[in-house]
Amino acid sequence: MSRSTCKVLYVSGEISPFIRVSALADFMASFPHAMEEEGCEARIMMPKYGVINDRKFRLHDVLRLSDIEVRSKEKTDLLHVKVTALPSSKIQTYFLYNEKYFKRNALFADMQQGSDVKNSLERVVFFNLGVLETLQRLGWKPDIIHCQDWYAGLVPLLLKTMYADCEFFKDIRTVLTVHNAYRQGIYPLKGFKKMLPSEVIDKMHVEDDTVNMLFTAVEHFDAVTTTSDAYAGMLADGRSEAFGLDRVIEKRASGLVGIANGLDAKQWNPAADKMIKKKFDIERLSEKTENKKYLLEEFGMELEEATPLVGSVINAERFQGSELLMESIDGLMELDIQLVVSVSGDKELIRRLQEKAKAYPEKLAVYSEFSDAIFHQIMASSDLLLIPAEVESCGMMQLFAIAYGSVPVVYTAGGNIETIEEIAGDKNGSAFVFHEYSVESLLATFEDALHTYADGERWERIVTGNMVRDLTWKNSAAKYNELYQGVRGGE
């Protein structure tokens, strides 16, 4: 297969900057562009949630993609498609919309997350069917449909059943990337029976009268990947972090492939970033201090020249470290640091963090929603970036931090270790690592980091060394391209 002829449709539940809840959105912001540079022709599909601003992102209607009929077992709904280009690229991004299913702001949720299960299940089925119906109306036939996590987990099963006799879909291959094994898309079987024919239902992964979308997906995609060798090992070996996924992985002849994340140097470049107060590079590191001063002033705090600023950008969901951060706040506040936290998700956790900020007004600031601009500004301003996730497939946060001269502090949690080099003792590297998931271990690691920070010359060597590291997608994109060729039979 010639690289230039590989056409790939990427399907995701979230993409930054349109909407961001997890690192998946960061992955999708850059990965399709990296694959285009590798020679693929990429297009993207995602839901048009109510929170996505049409004017801000220049979404526009496509007349020939209006009133697309999406037929489930008992009814027919109409699908409308809006389109824009993925920022910093010309990649066409299609937003699938139906007022009944996507007018509300929320992303997909399931029984694990205490969602409105009936409506959420209907949204999922509508979206999966809608992806295939939109492709037919569009008349653009991809060689590969590459889906992210469980949101489009029905696509390969639908291709093998309801759409098996459709000539348009002949020879299309499917790839799944698992970013988070905890999120599995679990719904009552009876809901699917109302919407899909028995030929689909009979091939779903069903346990205790519930359908597991992620397990179903792993059973039917042509290839399954995740975002690091370490996380692939964790999932395949049946550790607790696999959440049972090993039971379906072991049945696959081709197993699970780990390919690390990369960085888009055009999107994440402090020397050209329009979202930060002062652009900088290794020759202009003093401008990083100006960024720090600006961010602190935004939160009503004063710059303390000799005090490092710690940043943290977290989503308050399970295993992402929000509770560890909360438990560590008092201990962190005893150290000579200032801390700025951007947190989204759980309102109760946000309230608790805000109460802590009131108790430490000169040392702690909390921003209670996700903002792309604040995200970039924290990277540009902070000296250290706390990434408290307990389980991480690979993540992108440590890559952003390294590129912006903010030294990560991470737990030895899966794939993030593959993209950093530990600073230990007199040995320089790119990140500080705590090896026990506890407040005590985190605080001890911060004490080591502050000791290193106090050595100005060494700190500058670490920061400048980080900023010139090659973190790009180049090697990983080549591996994905090889995977695509293998899935298509090496044509």
UniProtKB/Swiss-Prot annotation:
EC supergroup of this enzyme: transferase
CDD domains hit by this protein: GT5_Glycogen_synthase_DULL1-like
Alphabetical list of InterPro entries matching this protein: Glyco_trans_1, GS/SS, Starch_synth_cat_dom
Binding site for ADP-alpha-D-glucose: R20
Keywords: Glycogen biosynthesis, Glycosyltransferase, Transferase
Molecular function GO terms recorded: alpha-1,4-glucan glucosyltransferase (ADP-glucose donor) activity; alpha-1,4-glucan glucosyltransferase (UDP-glucose donor) activity
Pathway it works in: Glycan biosynthesis; glycogen biosynthesis
GO biological process, one term: glycogen biosynthetic process
EC assignment: 2.4.1.21
Catalytically driven reaction(s): [(1->4)-alpha-D-glucosyl](n) + ADP-alpha-D-glucose = [(1->4)-alpha-D-glucosyl](n+1) + ADP + H(+)
Superkingdom classification of source: Bacteria
Keyword Transferase tagged: yes
Signal peptide interval: none
UniProt entry tagged with the keyword Lipid metabolism: no
Similarity remark: Belongs to the glycosyltransferase 1 family. Bacterial/plant glycogen synthase subfamily.
Function: Synthesizes alpha-1,4-glucan chains using ADP-glucose.
HAMAP family attached to this UniProt entry: Glycogen_synth
Name used for this protein in its record: Glycogen synthase
Lineage of source species: Bacteria, Pseudomonadati, Chlorobiota, Chlorobiia, Chlorobiales
